[in-house]
């Protein structure tokens, strides 16, 4: 169970890093928002899901 928790935290960190870098780049590029809107929303949905997953797994680990 601990390795699953660690992998979920690692995935959350990587996703957070990619969103912190990617979203401003998408918003700054010309015509970036309209063409990459689905990608940004998918990344945000993945991030929210990982936050809940880490929270649930944390109750089993600690």
Curated annotation (Swiss-Prot):
Which cysteines link up through disulfide bonds?
none
For the biological process aspect of GO, one term held by this record is: photosystem II stabilization
Cross-referenced Pfam families: Ycf9
Which regions span the lipid bilayer?
8-28, 41-61
Tell me the compartments it is located in: Plastid, Chloroplast thylakoid membrane
Q: What keywords are annotated for this sequence in UniProt? A: Chloroplast, Membrane, Photosynthesis, Photosystem II, Plastid, Reaction center, Thylakoid, Transmembrane, Transmembrane helix
Entry annotated with the keyword Oxidoreductase: no
Gene Ontology CC annotations of this record: chloroplast thylakoid membrane; photosystem II reaction center
The membrane topology noted for this protein in its Swiss-Prot or TrEMBL record is: Multi-pass membrane protein
Q: What is the annotated role of this protein in its UniProt record?
A: May control the interaction of photosystem II (PSII) cores with the light-harvesting antenna, regulates electron flow through the 2 photosystem reaction centers. PSII is a light-driven water plastoquinone oxidoreductase, using light energy to abstract electrons from H(2)O, generating a proton gradient subsequently used for ATP formation.
Subunit structure and binding partners: PSII is composed of 1 copy each of membrane proteins PsbA, PsbB, PsbC, PsbD, PsbE, PsbF, PsbH, PsbI, PsbJ, PsbK, PsbL, PsbM, PsbT, PsbY, PsbZ, Psb30/Ycf12, at least 3 peripheral proteins of the oxygen-evolving complex and a large number of cofactors. It forms dimeric complexes.
* Family to which the UniProt record says this protein belongs: Belongs to the PsbZ family.
This chain's protein is named Photosystem II reaction center protein Z
Species this chain originates from? Zygnema circumcarinatum
């Amino acid at each position: 169970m601990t390795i699953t928790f660690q992998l979920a935290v690692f995935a959350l960190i990587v996703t957070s890093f990619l969103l912190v870098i990617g979203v401003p780049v998408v918003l700054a590029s010309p015509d970036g928002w309209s063409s990459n809107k689905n990608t940004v929303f998918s990344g945000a949905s993945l991030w929210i899901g990982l936050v809940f997953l880490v929270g649930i797994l944390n109750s089993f680990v600690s």
